[in-house]
Regions:
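Interhelical loop and helix-boundary elements at the membrane-water interface
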Residues: 3-16, 77-88, 125-144
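Alpha-helical transmembrane segments of integral membrane proteins
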Residues: 19, 39-47, 87-91, 95, ...
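Membrane-interface helix caps and helix-loop-helix hairpins in membrane proteins
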Residues: 104-110, 127-136, 153-160
């Protein structure tokens, strides 16, 4: 069981997710001048993390053929067969649904809309189009990675100031 949990966790790209969430969390603190509403902060943090993890899983689902021929990505759970594409898809949908529910119920629509737009951008536009479009693909694709400070801010404040 723990092997499976570990493999599902790997679908979220935890190294990248960790860095994204540091910036989201820091912006939550700064947006409230160190006076956080803990419910909004925790639900926003978890919701953003779940949706970001979902987009990482979608990226691995769509890229598994490419991942299988690269040394750096050749041991990912879908490539190795430890998790099926179907199971990974269900996991990604679950994370997207729970993350969305948390943000919509406890935070606000603006945060959800921005987070969902980031999910679409990374999971589909970057993964299927930009990645193969030329030398500036990573710069344009970096838009998704730059969103967490804004997402964290709006999760606790509700506006873009």
């Amino acid at each position: 069981m723990s092997l499976t949990i570990t493999e599902y966790f790997k679908l979220t790209k935890p190294g990248v997710l960790y860095l994204l969430m540091i910036t989201a969390g820091a912006s939550m603190v700064l947006a409230t001048n160190f006076n956080l509403n803990l419910v909004k902060a925790l639900t926003g943090f978890i919701g953003i993390a779940f949706i970001a993890g979902s987009s990482a899983a979608i990226n691995q689902i769509l890229d598994f053929k490419y991942d299988s021929v690269m040394e750096r990505t050749g041991k990912r759970p879908i490539v190795t067969g430890k998790i099926s594409i179907f199971s990974a898809t269900l996991f990604a949908i679950f994370l997207l649904f729970i993350g969305s529910a948390l943000i919509l119920y406890f935070n606000n629509f603006l945060t959800w809309a921005l987070t969902f737009a980031t999910w679409v951008f990374y999971a589909f536009i970057y993964t299927k189009i930009l990645k193969f479009s030329g030398v500036l693909n990573i710069v344009i694709g970096g838009l998704a990675g730059s969103m967490p400070p804004l997402l964290g801010w709006t999760a606790v404040v509700g506006t873009i100031d």
